[in-house]
Amino acid sequence: METFKDVISSDQLVLVDFFATWCQPCKMMHPILEQVKEVLGDRIRIIKVDVDKYRVAASQYGIQSVPTLMLFRHGEVLWRTSGVMQKSELLATIDPFLR
């Protein structure tokens, strides 16, 4: 079974959505992330991490608020933000990292 560390350490660009089931803005991000995945396909991997279930990972990356989005490649944090982002804004942010 793949671990969180395995996933973020890969060659592929990985967008991690740190969320909570009780968080209303997190629920708003869900369809936006699905749309981003539709546009980018295999060029990115998107995973969701429930901060209440995976407290160690959330703590390790200093997650203070949800949703928090982080981009990883080779285990390195390339970018991070907290709060809801619109699809166009998120795609524009990710695009330079796809090259």
Regions found by a protein language model. Name each.
Residues 51-58:
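Structural microenvironment flanking redox-active thiols in thiol-disulfide oxidoreductases
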Residues 1-14, 55:
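A short beta-strand-turn-helix
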Residues 71-99:
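Non-catalytic, surface beta->alpha helical segment in thiol-disulfide oxidoreductase systems
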Residues 61-70:
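Structural micro-motif
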Residues 27-40:
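Typically the conserved alpha-helix immediately C-terminal to a functionally engaged Cys/Sec
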Residues 15-16, 46, 69:
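Hydrophobic beta-strand anchors of alpha/beta hydrolase catalytic cores
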Residues 16, 33, 50, 75:
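Residue-level signature of catalytic and energy-coupling elements of molecular machines
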Residues 12, 19-22, 65:
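Short pre-active-site segment immediately N-terminal to redox-active cysteine/selenocysteine motifs
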